[in-house]
Amino acid sequence: MNTKLSLSQTKIFTFTTWFNDTRSGLDRRSSISPTLCSKPVYSGKLKAAKETARIETSNTKNASIEDSFFSKIAINYLSKNLQDAAGISSSSKSTDYDRLVDTATRVSRNFDTKQQHEFVLSSLDRALPTVISSLIKMAFPPSKVSRELFALFTTISFAWLVGPSEVRETEVNGRKEKSVVYIEKCRFLEQSNCVGMCTHICKIPSQIFIKNSLGMPIYMEPDFNDLSCKMMFGREPPEIEDDPAMKQPCFEFCKSNKSYGVKH
């Protein structure tokens, strides 16, 4: 039988073959079979295939993370504070980070976004007593030095929560300073795989807490394409309704939405 391939069909076949070659390094085969059709190359099915591949790769990476003894204490402490603030308990048999994500997921499932912010803020207040936060606020008023110290402290102290990060240079009022934290791949976003949990359990309440309790404005800018995030100390965030992150639809394969019915 003679079959003629159009240009778009050829591109689809080539893309699928390349995708299988990439996956073969993991000793797995893609479930996508080369199909000849007249749809555009960047079709919905190929988008879904790419996202499935990203999720599987992320899960493989997460499985390799080994938290230190002190990291586990910090993770479980934050998880317990969030459970107490929301009046819930985690049913996860696992401890450490999986339980933290499970707790955050249950908060997202059972409460509206305003309540989510309140519970996270309450848990952060429990973790950092007012006396200590007030001292930090007085000792480090907004300045080039304090912004750089906040950035440095974040990279050193919070790898257990967000993953590896680094301090990057930026320009503030015409002067260069190292006050931006770049998170290569946010651990929380990667493991929860949920835009709604990123914005309402992490980003928004963290911005509010750091500014109100520690006196330091901060704007967190997640990139939902590569799961990276920038924390820009000293920069005021836009209003919640104007924040680009709030207009981002959740991933098609959002595990939290499918498993728990999380509302976005």
UniProtKB/Swiss-Prot annotation:
One of its GO terms (molecular function) is iron ion binding. It catalyses: all-trans-beta-carotene = 9-cis-beta-carotene. InterPro entries: D27-like, D27-like_C. One of its GO terms (biological process) is strigolactone biosynthetic process. The keyword Iron applies. It is an enzyme of class 5 (isomerase). Disruption phenotype: Increased shoot branching. Its main location: plastid. Expressed in hypocotyls and shoots. Expressed at low levels in roots. Keywords: Chloroplast, Iron, Isomerase, Metal-binding, Plastid, Transit peptide. Involved in strigolactones biosynthesis by catalyzing the isomerization of the C9-C10 double bond in all-trans-beta-carotene leading to 9-cis-beta-carotene and providing the substrate for CCD7. Strigolactones are hormones that inhibit tillering and shoot branching through the MAX-dependent pathway, contribute to the regulation of shoot architectural response to phosphate-limiting conditions and function as rhizosphere signal that stimulates hyphal branching of arbuscular mycorrhizal fungi and trigger seed germination of root parasitic weeds. This is Beta-carotene isomerase D27, chloroplastic. It comes from Arabidopsis thaliana. The lineage of its organism: Eukaryota, Viridiplantae, Streptophyta, Embryophyta, Tracheophyta.
